[in-house]
Amino acid sequence: MHLAVSLNITSGQPLGFSDLAGFAKQAEAAGLDMIVLDDSAPNSAGSSSFEATTLLAALATVTSRIGLVAAASTVAHQPYNLARRLASLDIISHGRAGWHATMAQAPREAANFSRPDGFSDDVFRRRTQEYIGIVQRLWQGWDADALLFDKIGGRFHDPEKMHLLDHKGEFFSVRGPLNVARSPQDTPVLVLSGLSEADLDIAARTADVVLLDRPTEDAKARHDDLKRRVVACGRDPGAVKLLLNVGADVAANALETLFSSQSCDGFNIAIPPAAIDGFIGRVLPELQRRVRPDYPGTALRSHLGLAGGAQ
């Protein structure tokens, strides 16, 4: 059973770094796969919080195993800058980084980035699909051994192992490559959520992890449908993990029952900042008794059973 915790750090009273560091350490001690941090507040103009990737870089220095996933919008960032920032986080964390890209629009966010009226659903979907493809290919712009740093021979890199993106699409033009080395786990983990029916094929082609809404009677059918789409895209069904979103008050027994019905690969537990203490004191000990005793490796991909580089 794979377990993630997600925390919107803009909800409620702002959290200090010491609070967040303590939470990350407790989650790691319990063996959870990853923390997903969201720093956006679509309905509140008065929110204040750290920027997610910057915060996760700091949390990487006080943890050593748990995955560190930043929510980052395709509206609020240019693909080159975001790819570079997440690749840097992956290097800093020794292969534990991930990107949570939501397929849902946030009107307030769009208004802050020169799109006061947002995008139509179709345009947003096409733009997001192009954006994700650019980021993933930028991450693959250098082979693992492409950078030589050969001072004597005067060679910075092996040209045969550098791959220019040279992308010219409907919405973006990006030449590449990144000025950051290849990620320790090949590419950071891509997490998608906010999926409509039309978005599921995008997820099947590109995602490593899919977050779906709270468990329902058709959870098993949704799980099987996604896995069929993954196979239809030429991928192994295990290449995409489906986690169901649940609340912080969920009972561990209920998770175990739902997981045994083969309706998902695990769960993403959404925690309001005000509920952190209760979650650490009541829920984490129960989860710790039910998950693996230790991490199988050091990289997020190894925790999730996904193919990649350093494990």
PLM regions: where:
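N-terminal small/glycine-rich loop or linker at the start of catalytic domains
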Residues: 1-15, 107-112, 161-195, 239-249, ...
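N-terminal beta1-alpha1-beta2 module of alpha/beta enzyme domains
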Residues: 1-63, 187-188, 298-299, 307-311
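Hydrophobic faces of well-ordered beta-strands that scaffold small-molecule active sites
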Residues: 3-7, 35-37, 66-72, 95-101, ...
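Flexible, glycine-rich active-site loops centered on histidine and acidic residues
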Residues: 6-15, 78-161, 217-218, 272
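Catalytic domains of carbohydrate-active enzymes, especially glycoside hydrolases
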Residues: 18-40, 200-213, 257-266
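Glycine-rich, proline-tolerant flexible connector loops at the mouths of alpha/beta enzymes
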Residues: 34-52, 213-220, 268-281
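C-terminal helical cap(s) of enzyme catalytic domains, especially alpha/beta-barrels
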Residues: 113-120, 131-136, 219-227, 273-296
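Long hydrophobic segments that form regular secondary structure
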Residues: 171, 178-232, 236
